[in-house]
Amino acid sequence: MAGNVKKAKAEIATIDVCLVTIETADGEFGFDTANSIAVEPQIEEQDAVKLVVKGILRAQKPKEVTLTGNEITLTDNVFNPELVLVLQGGTIKYDTQEPTKIIGYTPPVAGSSDKGEVFKLNAYSAQYDASGQIVQYEKITYPNCQGVPVAFGSEDGAFRAPEYTINSAPKTGEAPYEINYVPELPVLGA
């Protein structure tokens, strides 16, 4: 006779990149134009050690794998100078007549110590139920993120979709990410 097996308490189906927010020392800003976030765990491995005597395995120590952080690839559908400023540093140029209008961006000079800011990245995805209704949002927070220098390409007949590479590494005693469920998305304001 089969034993009683418990059913999982939660079966959470999430979809879409609904919102991405960046938390810096100056506050939090968000953008809803990203359409892809790929996360690659960064690991360090120590090889397994096996004791084989005359063709017989006598003992073995298994391979050890240590998670050291995550490499995040964020694909956005528009160029966001404020995001790039956080990722790699540099300077945003504003119009003198309209002080909130961005008229340019200059990256840090080659060899500069300007590397952007350390930040938290929050990625929100929607959770739907069987009726097609959003029931809540999944928020994954990655700590201690830093961007890598950004490059741009263009192609005839295609809008540019910049890819940003971000490295996240937890501090000692800190988790590499945290998942929370929230009833609604933060509201983007001016």
Predicted regions, residues:
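Extended, acidic-biased charged interface segments
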Residues: 114-143, 171
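Exposed beta-sheet edge/beta-hairpin loop segments within beta-rich domains
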Residues: 64-65, 108-113, 131-134, 150-161
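A general secondary-structure signal for short beta-strands and their flanking turns/coil
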Residues: 15, 67-71, 116-120, 135, ...
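Mixed-charge, glycine-accented linear interaction segment located at domain edges/termini
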Residues: 136-190
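Extracellular-facing segments of soluble proteins and assemblies that are Gly/Ser/Thr-biased and enriched
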Residues: 65-122
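Short acidic DE-rich linear segments
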Residues: 2, 104-107, 185-190
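Solvent-exposed edge beta-strands and adjacent loop segments
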Residues: 2-89, 144-158
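Short, surface-exposed beta-strand/loop "edge" segments at domain boundaries and coil↔beta transitions
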Residues: 27-30, 81-83, 125-137, 174-177
